[in-house]
Amino acid sequence: MKTHALLSALGRDRVGVADDLAEALAARKIDIEHSRMTALHGQCALIVQVRGERAHVTSLQDELAAIGSSLGFHLQLEPIALARATQGQPQLMLEAFSRGPSGFNAVTAVLKKRGINIEDLETDAYSSSWTSAITFQMRALLTVPPTCSVDTLTTELHDLERARKLEIVLKPVATTASKPPVPTSGI
């Protein structure tokens, strides 16, 4: 019987990390279904949804410390039950810019209050090329539940912009399902 698990990996970034982890999983007959990886200042973080026969996933759990040691990573494996996709309207992309990191808390508080799920989140901090001020940037992929009006959300975010001196951009995300395929040859 197939089972699913979530594997997280943390360690020093290096060339070949993704291949080494994929090879270790393939050798144990474990499939990678979904994954995210990022490198931050020389450190690497991976989160991987895996699938395999229950015995193979159990074996992976038993060998986790040895695999992690050989890769130079701290590994953690958690069995998961697949949940239904978040129900909601078409996804939105939110970008927010702030002179201080506390602005993001105000944005996420609005999203939480409205029952909006953050599907993907990235933040960055960078210095302005013409001043020494640090600007914080947040990018989030959102799923808005049917109970939340996008117009109401937009109004609330505009009010937050003015009150907290933020810059917030909210736009729909085009899906591949809404775009017709582009022919590559004559008809």
Predicted regions and their residues:
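A conserved regulatory-domain signal marking ACT and ACT-like small-molecule sensing domains
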Residues: 1-187
